[in-house]
Amino acid sequence: YHSGFSVASGETLLVFDYWMGRQGKKLPAAQRITPETLSHFSEVFVFISHGHEDHFDPVVYTWEQYAPVTYILPETMDASLHGRRMGVGGEITLSRHVKVKAFDSTDEGLSYLVEMDGIRIFHAGDLNNWHWREESTPREIEEAERDFQQVMETMRGEKVDVAFFPVDPRLGMMFDAGPNYFAMVVKPRLMIPMHFWERAEVIREYARRSRSPQTEIIAMTTPGDMILLEFDEQENMTVHMQSVTSAPVARNKKVQDR
């Protein structure tokens, strides 16, 4: 939901930027992470990119009552929050299944590249080209682009299987400049747009027109939408989409390793 995603492999669960929504637009109860959900996993890793309301819900700190939870958060966040703290460029081995590397953001906090059972997952947090082109001065636009491109250079050459990246229509004209540049530089095998503020129709159109032979793009627009990834012996990846609003669909889209 919004920028919140969970990724499971075996008995390991990753949770990124969990948020239950604003009052009046709360995440449906059936789509929330519950004690029952957590009970299925022997290790849970909760990644918090920064402290903005829409990326950090304090409810995550109640989960450790129900499962072995490790929290990963920026070293700049409130000192009262416990967990493994990271700075830009830091790397931590969290378990024999999971390790993480922290990258910078163009807003607060961090973005994370997590490897779980050989699958490399990037969550951008609020990393984007926040140019606000229709409101900003030419100098502000240039600075926003430069700051974003500098972070992208630190990611050049990183292998990414799945990327969660902001595609925010509020930016107005050229709202897709950031994700397009990210896809060009990093070439993730699968990109999932996020942070689109209920503008599902924009994201569906973006996914339709922006996918490429290098990067498949799938719009997960409804809380509870799921994707199943399968890998063969040659590391080709097959993507199966299941939406809560329709019957399961096997896209059988094979994305070959780079």
What are these model-predicted stretches?
Residues 8-14, 91-100, 113-121, 229-231, ...:
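Beta-strand-turn-beta hairpins that frame and shape the catalytic cleft
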Residues 82-94, 106-108, 176-258:
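Binuclear metal-ion centers of metallo-dependent hydrolases, dominated by the metallo-beta-lactamase
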Residues 15-17, 42-54, 71-75, 122-125, ...:
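Active-site neighborhood of phospho(di)ester-bond hydrolases with catalytic His/Asp-centered motifs
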Residues 4-47, 58-62, 127-157:
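Pre-active-site segment of Zn-dependent metallo-hydrolases
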Residues 106-184:
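Active-site-proximal loop/helix segments of hydrolase catalytic cores
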Residues 3, 22-23, 51-56, 78-81, ...:
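Active-site environment of divalent metal-dependent phosphoester hydrolases
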Residues 33-92:
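Active-site HxH/HxHxD metal-binding segment of metal-dependent hydrolases
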Residues 1-2, 41-42, 66, 95, ...:
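Extracytoplasmic
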